[in-house]
Amino acid sequence: KRSWVTGTRDFAIGLIPDLDYGDKTNQEASGKTQETAHAGLVGRLNYDFSNRYLVEFNFRYDGTYKFREGNRWGFFPGVSLGWRVSEEAFFKKLLPDMDNLKIRASYAKVGDEGDFDAFQYLDGYTSHGSYIMGSNGVTSGMTTVGMANPWLTWYESKIMNIGFEASYHRGLISVEFDWFRRNRSGLPATRVGSLPTIFGESMPQENLNSDINTGFEIVVGHKNRIGNFNYNVSANFSTTRIKYDYVERAASTNMYDDWRNNTNGRYKDIRWGKKV
C-alpha cells in the first residue's frame, strides 16, 4: 500500500483551495509505502450418527505480518457437540408432539491481532519534524519508533457455549437458550513504570490484560397458519457482563485508592454514587 499526501495553507483566495494559490513556503509533501500480509488454513470435520449425535471439530491456523517469526502463527481449535433428544425412541413416546429438542455445547479458542501495532518486534526510525543544522538550512529529522518487544503475539479468547433449542407442534411454540462465557487473555497494554527522561523511549505494548465476559440469550417464537396466511413472531432477551480479570495499572497509593480505582476483579461500567 502506497500513499502520498501534500498540502499547504494561507490561501490568497479562500474560495480556490488549490495548491498553487497557497503560501509556497508552507507547502508540504509526504508519502509512505506499507506492506501487509495474512495467511490462514481452515479445516472442519463433521460426524452425524442417526441424526441424533452430532460432533464437529474445526481449527484455524493463522499467520500475521505483525509479529516476529516464531510468534507469527497461531493454532486455534474448536469442538461442538449436539444431542437431538427428540430423535430418541423413549422421547417420541413420552412427548410425541415435541418436534425438536436439541442440547448443544461448544468450546473454541480464537486468536486476534487487530489491536496490535505492526512490527513492534523491530527497532527502527521514523521521520519527525525539521531542524536547522549549521549552515545547511532546514533538515528533516528522525526519531526512534520506540522500544522493541520480540515476544508480542496473538491474544486469545476461550469461548464456551451451552444451550438448547426446542420446538412444539410444528413450531407453534419454540424456545432457544444459550449461556456463554468468553475468557480473553494477552490483551495489549503498556506496562506501567517510570523510565529516566534521558532514556528517550516509551514502553512497548505487551500481552498483559485479561477479561471475562459471561451472559445468556433466550429467544421465544411462535408460528402458525390460518387459511392461506402464514405468520411467525419472536422475541428475544439477552444480557452480558464483562469483568476485568487483570488490568495493568500503577500501584495504589493507599487503601482507599485501591478500593476506589482498582478495577481488577470488578465488572465493567460500575457507577459510583450515593444511595438515596
Report the location of each language-model feature.
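Extracellular/periplasmic, surface-exposed regions of secreted and cell-surface proteins
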Residues: 1-269, 273
